[in-house]
Amino acid sequence: VAASFYDIPLADGACDTIVMVRVLHHAADVPATLRELRRILRPGGTLVLEHANKRHLKAMLRYAIRRGASPFTPEPYEYAPLNYAFHPAYLRRHLAEAGFAIEEERAVSIFRLALLKRLAPARLLVALDGLLQRPLAPLRLTPSIFLRCRAAGDARQPSPGRPLFRCLRCHATALDSDRPDRLLCRACGTAWPITDGIHRFR
């Protein structure tokens, strides 16, 4: 599916699990993105979310020698055009406001230093990273953080045959393929093309 994560063409509660890795740092409006993820995730569903950490150790050291922006302020830091790092507290607050509860956290990319990669074998660094992800998670000092979150609500088994897509124009869920190259909204008549197997909602 090709679409915007601010307006996802999926029906409410269409997903059991959502995985968003190396994506959120491109979101200029994090609250809107998280609200949309919560909308398409069924109550009790799981969100696995990775985010760039503004408050990582290297950023703190750079700030200490006055070579970088403050990693302690809550607002997102745009380190390149449309590339953002987020303070852990900022993201936790907006996850809670969107209706998510964090169940597990992992510190990732602990050894993201060019010098270490030259001095130590990649397999060793990967193994050490895996061992330290949980113990170091409470410190939140790594460049990347993974979160496993639960969507609020009664985690009942979803009903079979629930709709998958939602029309972006009228928000109806009565869409079907009247032809192999499109999805047609029966409510408003909008045709959404399918090209090379990709549903295009743009």
Residue locations for each model-derived region?
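Conserved SAM-binding strand-loop segment of SAM-dependent methyltransferases
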Residues: V1-A11
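A conserved beta-strand element that flanks and buttresses the S-adenosyl-L-methionine
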Residues: V19
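A C-terminal cap/extension of S-adenosyl-L-methionine-dependent methyltransferases
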Residues: R66-A69, R93, E97, E103-R179
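Acceptor-substrate binding/catalytic loop of class I
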Residues: S70-Y90
